[in-house]
Amino acid sequence: MKNKILTIVIPTYNMEALLGRCLDSLLINGSPNSALEVLVIIDGATDRSSEIAHGYETRFPEIFHVIDKPNGNYGSCINKGLAEAQDKYIKILDADDSVDSTGLMELITVLQRYDTDLILTDYSLCNTEGDVLSRKSFNIDSYTLHNRQALTPLGAHMAMHAVTYKTENLRRIEYHQTEGISYTDQEWIFRPMTTVNSFLYLNTNVYRYTVGRDGQTMDIDSMARNMHHNLTVLRNLTATYSDVNRDDDIYGYLRNRIEGYAEYIYSLYLYNTERMDLAPLITFDKDLSSLCPTLYRYLGTLYAGKLPFVKLWRLFYYKKDHGINNFFRYRRYRPNLKK
């Protein structure tokens, strides 16, 4: 595998309908890309996902490798993929998504020419038919090596779809993604960033992110059932954030990232109180005041319209044993929920 440069890890659970499209997008006019290693991690799937993946492995053994394992959720697939990856760089591709073949080739060319810790690329949001709805880019010079401080303004809008890491950096910090829960992709764009000293942005679309599919973890019904998973992830991010020195150049990125994510979680909870069990949020919020006072204070400054909604929620719920859910049912007070 000496000519290979990039390992793509594909966590896969019951994706028989879309896995073929995903794997096809990694081929060049139907032929294997010799610079790629593709690890398809079958996470205890009960449909034909494994059969489909093994079919590609049989046809293109030089790039596709299938790993069947018991179900352990998303993070366990990332951990397995990282352990097995043999190439200099690593990228995650979800089985219901795909890549832009032209953009992928440009990314590979850049990986072969530059030596850096992180490569950021554009990604597009697509509907289930594959039509591009929008494209996400970064307001920073392309084809230029930047230092880690330049990540600061990008923190609030970072997504796992945009990142490609140097593999050895993640192993050096013994990176381990939380297993058994959803939404751990947030961890992938947090602690690994502490290993970045230089990065390059390539304003080419590589990743095609499918939205609007029934059963996605970002579906509001799925999120309502699993919001405690988000809180577990946020607690993990808080531990990393608290350990980083404020003078570190990466601190600004982590601050922007965790503040945006925390605001998103609190907003979803407090504007969907009829669907949510608030007990986990109350426990987390009480712990947060001592775990990370700066984040606790920041959340208290958030406004919806003219209402400091988190501050009021804390005041009414904690001190009067009385919720203020009615404040959050009026659309004029709804905040701008960040994606």
Question: Locations of the language-model features?
Answer:
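A conserved acidic beta->alpha catalytic loop
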Residues: S25, I42-E51
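Membrane-interface aromatic/basic loop that binds lipid-linked glycans or pyrophosphate carriers
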Residues: Y271-K339
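Donor-binding/catalytic cores of nucleotide-activated saccharide
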Residues: Y74, I78, A95-L200, Y209-A224
